[in-house]
Amino acid sequence: MKKILSLLLLVNCQLSTVNCFAQTLTLDECIGKALEYNKSLSSAKMKLDQTTFDMKSYKANFYPQINLLALDFYSTARGEFTIEGGHLPIYSLDASGKYVPNVTVNDDGSYTLNQYADFPSQSMKWKLKNIFVGSVSVMEPLYAGGKISTAYEMSKLGVNMAQENIRLTESEVVVKTHEAYYLAVKAKELGEVARSYKTLLDELKKNVEGAFRHGMSTRNDIMKVQVKQNEAELSIQKADNGYQLALMNLCHIIGLPLTSEVEVVKAEDAPAASSLPVPVEMGVRPEHVILDNKTELARQNVKLTRSDYLPNVAVGASYAYSHGGELAGKKLLNNGSASLGVVVKMPIDLFGGSTNKVRSAKAAYQIAQMEQQDLDEQMQLEWAQSKNLYDEAQTELRLCQTALEQAAENMRLSKQQYEVGFEPLADYLETQAHWQQCSANLVNARCQLQLAYVQLMKASGTLSVH
């Protein structure tokens, strides 16, 4: 017997130690951890970095493009060529100061050189050896049909959409964390309600057993109380299991190991409906901003598509230097050259390809406009539904509070009636069970009100992540 008592004492001490070292987390702390850990949010932030880099790259298209080229190669190619020799006429200066050939006209009209110089054949060798070519070129677009400016504007829209996507993801993380946190709070408080109910039954059982010993009650009364005790034990076990699973789910969301020892605390009550913001429009919601930018992106795409079939004008300049090679023992290449030019490109649409592509882009823009209108109406409907659910949750909470007060008073009166013998045990047990049910309903109503409040804030675009 002493060994059993020692073992129970050791187990209780270990459980107390675990509870003492359990980390107590508030709702704000869980939201902060979830925002740091959430992979979807990290991906959204990386998407913002990507779109920012894209925007900067498109902005660079406004500036001149500068290219450097350097080529150095060695070749063993070599060869020799000969310039054939011949007779070169000799010119004389006449009285008018003009050069005339020194020739004799033959009878057949042909010419015979009176004097000439003999030009011998010339042989020259060449080698490529090492040749270096270097150049620098500058190209500045003057007009590209609006493609450069349109692409830049579209990249800025992409950055804005990425920023709003971060807001949207943050709000989704906050809502998800609220749901997980209040699921744990609900399970914890349901366990407390079940334990309170069990305490009432334990006290009642002692009284019934005492009355049985004095012959004032039957064994059947004891069995009735024991049945309720068993039901209470099962409710406690279910609540504890639900609480552990809810804590594991919360740890998963906030990035802690599933086996972490954590506890949750009761959060503040949700504000009254009269203090809630009533949005005039859905423009503050990130979903609306994303849709608006998506529609504008489709409009800009019409301009971008049209720019492919407009004239393109660019001006360019370059300088090149060449060095290397040998011809007749002397350097062949050793000079530089500069050039300046204008490029004009004018696409010609002979078969309607450009026209149809522009029409297709316009159709996509109209589709985006209709989708935006439809989703705007859906968001307004979502807000109205969230507002109704919040009002209903407040009404349910108020009714549950009243019902619990009535159940507590009914249980008190029933206890008095039972103790003086004016009410059977079954009726008293029924009032206790009713009190336990009203307490559980109140816990559920409080948690549902908090979740309805968060959903309403998200639907109105006023949900803060801080």
What are these regions (language model features)?
Residues 21-80, 251-254, 258-299, 347-348, ...:
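Bacterial Sec-pathway N-terminal export signals of envelope proteins
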Residues 42-46, 59-60, 126, 142-170, ...:
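Sec/SRP-type N-terminal targeting helices
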Residues 6-21:
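Short, basic, low-complexity termini and linkers enriched in Ser/Thr/Gly/Pro
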Residues 67, 74-93, 258, 441-466:
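Acidic, low-complexity, intrinsically disordered peripheral segments
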Residues 29, 53-55, 164-282, 386-389, ...:
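Periplasmic alpha-helical coiled-coil/stalk elements that build and connect Gram-negative outer-membrane
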Residues 234-256, 404-462:
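Short segments within alpha-helical structural elements
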Residues 69-137, 267-272, 316-348:
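Small/polar, glycine/serine/threonine/aspartate-rich low-complexity segments that form flexible
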Residues 1-4:
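Positively charged n-region of N-terminal signal peptides that target proteins for export
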